[in-house]
Amino acid sequence: TAWPPTSLIMTQALRVLNQLLAPEIASGKVKIRIIEGMTFERRVELGESLPADVLAACKECNVLIKGPFTTPRAGDKFPDGTPMPNMVSANSLLRRSLDLFAAVRPIKIPEKNIDWCFFRENIEGEYIWGNKGIQVNDDLAIDFKVQTRQGSERIARAAFEYARKNGKHNVTAITKANIVKLADGNFLKAVHHIGETEYPD
């Protein structure tokens, strides 16, 4: 993030952290470190979506609280009309570099009897080569989706393990295997295999 933080999210996150961890911070047990260097302008200047010094600093920390990163969309332009570069998503690079393969999203709405937890594969699929597509001509573009058995089994295992530890007996795999026969089809096979062989309960 930039310092002082320009994002309301990071401003409030730091405020809450300083309140919650006040004793630990005062004793020196916990140190809050601000990692700078992720402004879009700097990344464009360096030609790096995730600068090496920023990644190295992230790897030195035990816990990361990340603010929003800006990744230009295809066709975005600078204020002067110059096209923005086709950059890999900094979020995707950070996930891959730190092996953050699972996006875990719990949702609880007791009055509607909703107690769900979503596990989304965070590294493979469309995320792995998001800027490596092929523009065949003005009328045709091709992008890639990559799914490995190992990646599919790992996210499935994480979801099943969470379910077991939290007393849940239903795990649902959501795919487009009816359309994306190979990548999503293989993902679905991997989920069923892990469920049947390792988590029959």
Segments (PLM) and residue ranges:
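Glycine-rich beta-alpha junction loops
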Residues: 36-38, 71, 122-123, 175-180
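N-terminal glycine-rich phosphate/adenylate-binding segment common to multiple enzyme folds
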Residues: 42-142
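Conserved beta-strand termini and adjacent loop/short-helix elements that scaffold enzyme active sites
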Residues: 33-37, 106-109, 174
